[in-house]
Structure formats: C-alpha cells, structure tokens
Amino acid sequence: MRFYISTADLNAGISVIAKALPSRTAMPILEGIYAEAQGNNLLLRCNDLSLQIETLLPATVEKEGSLVFPGRLFLDLARRQPDEQTMIETDKTTVTMKSGRARATMQAFDAAEYHSMPFSRQEFFVNIKKNTLKSMIRQTIFATAQDETK
C-alpha cells in the first residue's frame, strides 16, 4: 500500500476515529487503526467491540491495500508531521510514514486479523434541536459512571 494524503486531513480523520480506540484490551490488534487505501480514498476504522467509528478521507493512492497501524503511536506521529503532505507506504508487516524531512517506521498487523463490527445499511435519522439535546444531556449526566469498573 502506498498513498499520499494531506497532513491536515489525516489528523482530522484520526481525531474522529480515535474516540473508539481502546486504551487496554485483551486483543492487541484492536489497539490499532485499520487503514484501507482504495481508489482515491483512505478508509480509517477503529473499534473497541462496542463502538466502531469509520471515516473516509481523500488520498492519492498509488498502490491499494490494507493494514492495521499501531493506534497510539500512529496518532502521535501523524500529529507531529512537519509538512503539508504525508506519504505512507507499507509492506506486509511495516509502515513507513514520511513528511518533509521526517521519517518513521513502525510494525503493523495484518488487516485480515482485524475484527470489524457488522455494518447495518439501514438509515434512521432523528432531528433534535441543539438546546433540547443539551438539556437532555444535562438531565442525565449525573448518572454516568466515573470509571469503567462500574
């Protein structure tokens, strides 16, 4: 896999999906970011077995493929890229990220091992006014757990 992507787009996409990136899990591959370069797009996906978030980003794809990047490390490196354009190249087990004079290489997982949640194509929308949603959250926030053990 080899593609070029705007560093700003990459950081925006990673920020969105990182919300589903688990900090601890019994399955190390779930601590990664699934990436698939196809056509003129890059699909990024994270899940913690209860929540899955995906985003599709525009990219210049030279070689299609998929791999699972190490989540937190990839997130930190992407945020520190110095140039406007980032090039990411992979082989079966490594990822190389280049931007300007910066270059980083890291180990990766095989995409076939990644556990994706089934995606339902049913469309269901609810429109709620912003103030109504804020009020609903304020009235229920007291009941949320402070940590994951409860």
Describe the residue ranges of each PLM region.
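Structural preference for solvent-exposed beta-strand-turn elements
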Residues: 1-150
